[in-house]
């Protein structure tokens, strides 16, 4: 009977003893030194024992009834399975000594298979015939077996030719009684040492899933194609409180990033489902091999099948459920922008595997325990509008962590931000995953008698509650016992006073965000999420990411905001009840509002006739040390010192020029700077964006100046002496 295993079609690498679905060596985004350490630990030669990291692809029984009468037949079958993406690569360690070949579990080092040298009948390499370029083939037959097994291994770190030479030298020594193998191992050891010293850096881990051609795999239909172009008339697919919308290019870039995240998420879900299916298949094959056996002794190939049949851990199930929820959120967000397949088609692709995974778990309990990420209101509405009855029943069985949108979720305890880890090693940009303030749908409804003064302030300033149409009396938002105008003065309730100190510079990227400088102290208007709304001393307000904030101490707040023991708070809008005379009378209300508007217009006209008052606001002058693409090492060093990086970082990076520093990616900076590498990369990204914005602004000014000159030239040429300044029509 044929024994084979299959593989997921998604790219990537697995961790530990998990299967791998491609022929690419596992090159994660980790440190180069970690790669070398892993390589040296997996591929070793000591005395007469050698060890190689390989991937078990398949095991076939040489059986004419299975159309496998020879080694060539087995190779053809493997090529056929590989072309249909039905090969599942399982990481193992292949150990060769003077008595046997052993297969070990990568994680536990447990022995999976033991092939005594007399049972190894044949070995050969299969090069460049599959998507796996370097394959080792072994034919083994135990004394208890009627038919031999043919095993295939992908040699992903040491070439198959070297491994085969090692095995053949061990077989020759065993059969002929010679000692030729030590010399072979000596040459191999030198080659492995050379390879370790020149091990290449990791390839770029960021996949571009939507560039896959539709015919590449049977599962290509479950991948999102290129995003639809952003219509000129569409202001953006995010709800915003500001009238300033994202530029079309920025919006298109964001949609592209989110499409990429969606495709990576679908890849990982698909890989997990394929792994479950292959585990079930391996379990079935294992039982068939054990059938009819009188001895309890482990038979040939049963060790690898046992490893393949091992179910995923609970943590891996949780990870898959989290990615399913993330995919649902992204489908709802991108439903107007993706095609071939559409979001409505992909949601059915998600719920089919979800049903299989929950059945594998035995109950929906694990799925119910997964709260992060919460579904958005749009996602919940999207599911209600597209699920068929069977899928709706499954969804409802998962409970409120799947059905209750984040806008209705309690503020405390706060559900953490979900940052997925993909098998490919690609790290999604945090700015895409982090909820921007205009995407947050507000807080859960809390009874008014449970609102503390602090909570009341947060609710009041929440964008989604500022224009509430609910039957909540406006004055109920104010602290108990206060008058409607109690918050207009300069002495607010102590619980309302909160200041934070800025740890790093932050440059606003749109009208909703606020640019801040390191060590600046700002007043908190809204908190509790990834973005906090702050107000600076100049009265400007906007959103700032909370990971660059620290609680301000009393001495940090300083005198300007605390003169005479009084803390300044901007006047809040007065609250008024609707006069009873207008309640329920729409026409009267409109007439009243017209009168109010007329009154306001008169006041505004009167104000315009008054002498203009020039208010001058003192601002702290930031220390600005430019870093450009023309900067030399001295300017780079000064910029690093101004950003308060450690002396080691200044010493290591201060020898570079501006272009050299800008050319380093995040992983390269981490290798040089350690933990501070991420912050260096973040500061460089902000600086690069500032330079690009500055350059685009100057280019725009040149273009506008050129247009004005052209218009002036045209006007002067077409202006008559009698009507100077008026162009002829």
Swiss-Prot record:
Subcellular location(s) of the protein: Cytoplasm; Cell projection, Stereocilium
Main location: cytoplasm
Gene3D superfamilies listed in its UniProt record: Pleckstrin-homology domain (PH domain)/Phosphotyrosine-binding domain (PTB), SH3 Domains, Transcription Factor, Ets-1
CDD domains in UniProt: PTB_EPS8, SAM_EPS8-like, SH3_Eps8
Keywords: Cell projection, Cytoplasm, Phosphoprotein, SH3 domain
InterPro entries for the chain: EPS8-like, EPS8_2nd, EPS8_PTB, Eps8_SH3, PH-like_dom_sf, PTB, PTB/PI_dom, SAM/pointed_sf
Outcome of gene disruption: Mutant animal have a progressive and severe hearing loss at young adulthood. The generation of receptor potentials in hair cells at lower sound pressure is impaired, which leads to a reduction in auditory nerve responses.
GO cellular component: centrosome; cytosol; protein-containing complex; ruffle; ruffle membrane; stereocilium bundle; stereocilium tip
Bias (Pro residues): 199-208
Chain ranges of the PID domain: 46-202
PTM annotation (Phosphothreonine): residues: 306
Pfam families: EPS8_2nd, PTB, SAM_3, SH3_1
Biological process according to GO: positive regulation of ruffle assembly; Rac protein signal transduction; regulation of Rho protein signal transduction; Rho protein signal transduction; sensory perception of sound
Region of interest (Disordered), ranges: 1-25, 182-247, 449-492, 695-729
PANTHER family in alphabetical order: EPIDERMAL GROWTH FACTOR RECEPTOR KINASE SUBSTRATE 8-LIKE PROTEIN 2 (PTHR12287:SF20), EPIDERMAL GROWTH FACTOR RECEPTOR KINASE SUBSTRATE EPS8-RELATED PROTEIN (PTHR12287)
Function, in words: Stimulates guanine exchange activity of SOS1. May play a role in membrane ruffling and remodeling of the actin cytoskeleton. In the cochlea, is required for stereocilia maintenance in adult hair cells.
Family as reported in the entry's similarity comment: Belongs to the EPS8 family.
Protein name (database record): Epidermal growth factor receptor kinase substrate 8-like protein 2
């Amino acid at each position: 009977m044929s024994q084979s295993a299959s593989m997921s079609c998604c790219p990537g690498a697995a961790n530990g003893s998990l299967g791998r679905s491609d022929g690419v060596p596992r090159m994660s985004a980790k440190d180069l030194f970690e790669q070398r350490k892993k390589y040296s630990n997996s591929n070793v030669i000591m005395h007469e024992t050698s060890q190689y990291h390989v991937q078990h692809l398949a095991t076939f029984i040489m059986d004419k009834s299975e159309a496998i009468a020879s080694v060539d037949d087995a190779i053809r079958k493997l090529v056929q399975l590989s072309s249909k993406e039905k090969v599942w690569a399982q990481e193992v360690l292949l150990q060769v000594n003077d008595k046997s070949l052993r297969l070990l579990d990568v994680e536990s080092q447990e022995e999976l298979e033991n092939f005594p040298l007399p049972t190894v009948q044949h070995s050969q390499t299969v090069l460049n015939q599959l998507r796996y370029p370097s394959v080792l083939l072994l034919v083994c037959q135990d004394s208890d077996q009627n038919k031999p097994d043919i095993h295939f291994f992908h040699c992903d770190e040491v070439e198959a030719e070297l491994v085969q030479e090692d095995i053949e030298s061990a077989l020759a020594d065993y059969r002929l009684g010679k000692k030729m193998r030590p010399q072979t191992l000596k040459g191999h050891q030198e080659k492995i040492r050379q390879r370790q010293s020149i091990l290449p850096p990791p390839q770029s881990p960021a996949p571009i899933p939507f560039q896959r051609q539709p015919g590449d795999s049977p599962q290509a239909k479950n991948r999102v194609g290129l995003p639809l172009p952003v219509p000129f008339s569409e202001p953006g697919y995010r709800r915003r409180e500001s009238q300033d919308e994202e530029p079309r290019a920025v919006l298109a870039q964001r949609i592209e990033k989110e499409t990429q995240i969606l495709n990576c998420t679908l890849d990982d879900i698909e890989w997990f489902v394929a792994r479950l299916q292959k585990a079930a298949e391996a379990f079935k094959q294992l039982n068939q091999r054990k059938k009819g056996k009188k001895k309890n002794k482990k038979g040939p190939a049963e060790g690898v099948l046992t490893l393949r049949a091992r179910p995923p851990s609970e943590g891996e199930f949780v990870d898959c459920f989290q990615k399913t929820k993330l995919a649902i959120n992204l489908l709802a967000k991108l439903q107007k922008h993706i095609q071939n397949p559409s979001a409505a088609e992909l949601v059915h692709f998600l719920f089919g595997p979800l049903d299989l995974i929950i059945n594998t778990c035995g109950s929906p309990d694990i799925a119910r325990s997964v709260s992060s990420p919460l579904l958005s209101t749009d996602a919940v509405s999207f599911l209600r509008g597209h699920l068929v009855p069977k899928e709706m029943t499954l969804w409802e069985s998962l409970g409120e962590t799947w059905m209750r949108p984040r806008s209705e979720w309690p503020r405390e305890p706060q559900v953490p931000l979900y940052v997925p880890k993909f098998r490919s090693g690609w790290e999604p940009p945090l700015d895409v995953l982090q909820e921007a303030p205009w995407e947050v749908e507000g807080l859960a409804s809390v009874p008014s008698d449970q609102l503390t003064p602090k909570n009341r302030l947060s609710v009041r300033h929440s964008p989604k509650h500022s224009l509430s149409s609910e039957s909540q009396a406006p004055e109920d938002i104010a602290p108990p016992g206060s008058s409607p105008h109690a918050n207009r003065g300069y002495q607010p309730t102590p619980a309302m006073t909160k200041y934070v100190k800025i740890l790093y510079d932050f440059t606003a990227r749109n009208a909703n965000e606020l640019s801040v400088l390191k060590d600046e102290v700002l007043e908190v208007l809204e908190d509790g999420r990834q973005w906090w709304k702050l107000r600076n001393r100049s009265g400007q307000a906007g959103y700032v990411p909370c990971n660059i904030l620290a609680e301000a101490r009393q001495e940090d707040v300083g005198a300007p905001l605390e003169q005479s023991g009084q803390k300044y708070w901007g006047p809040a809008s007065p609250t008024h009840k609707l006069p009873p005379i207008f309640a329920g009378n729409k026409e009267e209300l409109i007439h009243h509002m017209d009168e109010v508007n007329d009154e306001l217009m008169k006041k505004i006209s009167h104000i315009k006739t008054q002498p203009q008052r020039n208010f001058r606001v003192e601002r702290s002058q930031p220390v600005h040390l430019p870093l450009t693409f023309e900067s030399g090492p001295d300017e780079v060093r000064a910029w690093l010192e101004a950003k308060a990086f450690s002396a080691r970082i200044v010493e290591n990076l201060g020898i570079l020029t501006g272009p050299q520093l800008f050319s380093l990616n995040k992983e390269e900076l981490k290798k040089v700077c350690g933990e501070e590498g991420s912050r260096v990369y973040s500061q460089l990204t902000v600086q690069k964006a500032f330079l690009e914005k500055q350059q685009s602004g100057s280019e725009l000014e040149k273009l506008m100046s050129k247009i004005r000159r052209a218009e002036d030239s045209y006007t002067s040429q077409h202006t008559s002496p009698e009507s100077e300044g008026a162009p002829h029509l």
